[in-house]
Design a protein with these regions (language model features):
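Amphipathic alpha-helical segments used for helix-helix packing
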Residues: 89, 94-95, 126-153
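C-terminal peripheral helix-coil segments that are non-catalytic and often amphipathic
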Residues: 1-32, 164-168, 172, 202-232
């Protein structure tokens, strides 16, 4: 099913039984941490990621430089390069850290779960830094297979894990039947993710239309239309 809203990534223990992408990825064995090396400073990492999004919003992809990010974050360039060897890796992680604010929380019904995550996802997409970064990544990723792979690993896959957890919540509540075939279930999870994320991104980033509470209700009703028993 669908992911729902989650607390900022710097809070290690999300409230209300929520599950973050980092925790969800760990639960299914997906890689999230980088390799070995000098101990990381969480404060420095956050400052760098914040500075990256700020620079993207102001300068765009073409104007962003590693030196400018280091200066904005108040760290040495060597510190920045030790953590992120390339601009593309840095930008992907800066955006991934925003979407790490989504949380899979059981709100009592599949419809409520979907409505909550769509609302929070839309909020994140309306941020100027998010829009600038995503549009740049989409453009660059179309020309760079390695960047496209990193986008899939750091941004897309963690959110698909949350879709999987939301689906499991619905099954535990008896709203959905248990999965019978893992391959089919995985394919369905991908379709659900693409439908929700793609629709919201297209409406906000391409059409420039707002995502209102009424629109979210109508979208969710349409999404669950083939399953009337899931509608409140």
């Amino acid at each position: 099913m669908a992911p729902t809203t989650r607390q900022p990534a710097e809070q290690p223990h999300p409230p209300d039984g929520g599950t973050t992408p980092a925790a969800a990825a760990a639960a299914v064995g997906a890689p999230h941490a980088r390799g070995k090396g000098r101990p990381r400073s969480a404060a420095a990492d956050q400052a760098i990621l914040d500075a990256t999004r700020e620079a993207l919003a102001e300068l765009g992809w073409g104007g962003l430089t590693m030196g400018d990010v280091a200066q904005r974050a108040g760290v040495a360039k060597t510190t920045l390069y030790r953590r992120w060897p390339s601009k593309s890796e840095l930008v992907v992680d800066a955006i991934a850290s925003l979407f790490d604010q989504l949380e899979c929380t059981d709100r009592g019904s599949l419809q409520a779960d979907i409505e909550a995550v769509v609302a929070r996802f839309a909020e994140l997409l309306t941020l100027p830094e998010t829009q600038a970064a995503l549009l740049a990544l989409f453009a660059e990723g179309s020309r760079d297979p390695q960047l496209r792979l990193r986008i899939r690993e750091r941004i897309v896959q963690p959110q698909k894990v949350l879709v999987e957890l939301g689906r499991a919540n619905a099954q535990a509540r008896g709203e959905m039947d248990p999965d019978r075939d893992p391959a089919t279930a995985d394919e369905e999870i991908g379709i659900i993710f693409d439908t929700i994320a793609g629709t919201v991104e297209h409406r906000l980033l391409v059409s420039g239309e707002p995502v209102t509470a009424d629109w979210i209700r109508r979208f969710t009703t349409l999404l669950l239309g083939p399953f009337p028993g899931l509608l409140r």
